[in-house]
């Protein structure tokens, strides 16, 4: 799983983005290996990020949840399964806001376990995603949000993968939220430079857009 929680975490409905409604999910071959299950969860998350139809998002969340349960039943300590389970819980939180608090707490638990298992998974994904959840979620008593803890997690991600743009974007967001505008601008600039050094791709363009937006504020 590469970048679905990557730069956006829109699957948390904390910064939900939507394009035009799309058709319901098409039938797909049942994934069987850990790698296939992780890839299937990633595909559901990517689609959910750009899906306006709440019913389709709920179907994608349910599908991702089933794949995550299968993966965890087979390899309960594997970083891919723990991380995939966390992503699936993010989809669940978006699809069912009334249960979001419980889903996000479980998500953070799985991310912590994934980070302990393999902190480098998905370009330091466990720390990066943890950072975004903590930075964007409401704080107690409404949710598990904790900006300072999120900033610490973002710094861990950057320390592991300093040239991966989403890690720098998460750091910039945390710095901005804590009032460090100078530090945030520096991180956004570093994210832009890192993205510009990559081959042209949709993810790269999204990262450049987010960095440029951050530099304008």
PLM regions and their residue ranges:
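Terminal, low-structured helical/coil segments at or just beyond the last alpha-helical repeat
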Residues: 22-27, 177, 185-217
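Bacterial Sec signal peptide processing site at the extreme N-terminus
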Residues: 15-34
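Helix-turn-helix repeat elements of alpha-solenoid scaffolds
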Residues: 54-69, 100-109, 143-151
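TPR alpha-solenoid repeat register
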Residues: 81, 124-126, 167, 201
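TPR/TPR-like (Sel1-like) alpha-helical repeat modules
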Residues: 108-109, 115, 145-149, 181-198
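Short coil turns that delineate tetratricopeptide repeat
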Residues: 76, 119-121, 162
């Amino acid at each position: 799983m590469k970048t679905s929680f990557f730069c956006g975490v829109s699957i948390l409905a904390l910064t939900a983005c939507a394009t035009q409604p799309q058709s319901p999910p098409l039938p797909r071959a049942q994934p069987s290996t850990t790698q296939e299950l992780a890839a299937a969860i990633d595909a559901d998350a990517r689609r959910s990020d750009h899906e306006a139809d709440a019913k389709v998002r709920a179907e994608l969340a349910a599908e991702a949840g089933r794949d995550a349960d299968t993966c965890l039943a087979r390899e309960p300590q594997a970083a891919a399964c723990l991380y995939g389970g966390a992503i699936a819980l993010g989809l669940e939180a978006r699809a069912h806001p009334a249960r979001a608090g419980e889903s996000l707490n479980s998500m953070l638990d799985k991310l912590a376990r994934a980070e302990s298992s393999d902190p480098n998974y998905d370009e330091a994904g466990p720390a990066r995603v943890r950072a975004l959840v903590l930075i964007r979620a409401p704080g107690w008593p409404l949710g598990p949000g904790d900006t300072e803890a999120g900033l610490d997690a973002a710094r861990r991600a950057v320390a592991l993968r300093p040239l991966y743009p989403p890690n720098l974007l998460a750091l910039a967001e945390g710095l901005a939220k804590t009032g460090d505008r100078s530090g945030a601008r520096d991180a956004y600039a570093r994210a832009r430079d890192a993205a510009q050094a990559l081959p042209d791709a949709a993810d790269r363009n999204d990262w450049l857009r987010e960095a440029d937006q951050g530099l304008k504020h």
